[in-house]
Design a protein with these regions (language model features):
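Gly/Pro-rich, tryptophan- and cysteine-flecked surface segments typical
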Residues: 20-121
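Bacterial N-terminal signal peptides
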Residues: 8-15
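Bacterial N-terminal signal peptides that target proteins for export
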Residues: 1-8
Length: 121
């Protein structure tokens, strides 16, 4: 019985060491009016592929859009919501440290481009 305990502890330690650390990044709120869009952008700035979920959230905390992605190094992804969906901020659930990602929220106007942008923290 005594020999089983060190083996079990070693196995548990190995399992925990290999588990990716999840981090959540939030943006400040922006309001896309009229026909504008709200974009939740995420870029992987690390040197290995990373999994993430990009979520556009309304003022009541409800999910408006959700996108699950695996981002290669240097790759980006976006969750986009229309003004009529009442999205207000973005939540990024990422595997890794905040330093592995750059996140932002943008209001995009058709024919113009981004008219407002804020960084996630």
């Amino acid at each position: 019985m005594k020999a089983a305990l060190p083996t079990a502890l070693f196995a548990l330690g190995t399992l925990l060491a290999g588990t990716a650390r999840a981090t959540t990044i939030f943006t400040p709120p922006l309001v896309p009016g009229g026909n504008n869009l709200l974009d939740c952008y995420l870029v992987n700035v690390s040197d290995e592929p990373r999994n993430a979920t990009i979520v556009a959230v309304d003022r009541d905390g409800n999910t408006v859009k959700s996108v699950d992605v695996t981002l290669q190094p240097g790759a980006e992804a976006v969750a986009q919501a229309t003004a009529s969906e009442n999205a207000r901020y973005c939540r990024f659930e990422v595997d890794g440290k905040k330093a592995h990602f750059r996140a932002s929220i943008l209001v995009v106007q058709d024919g113009v481009g981004s008219v407002s942008a804020l960084a996630g923290q």
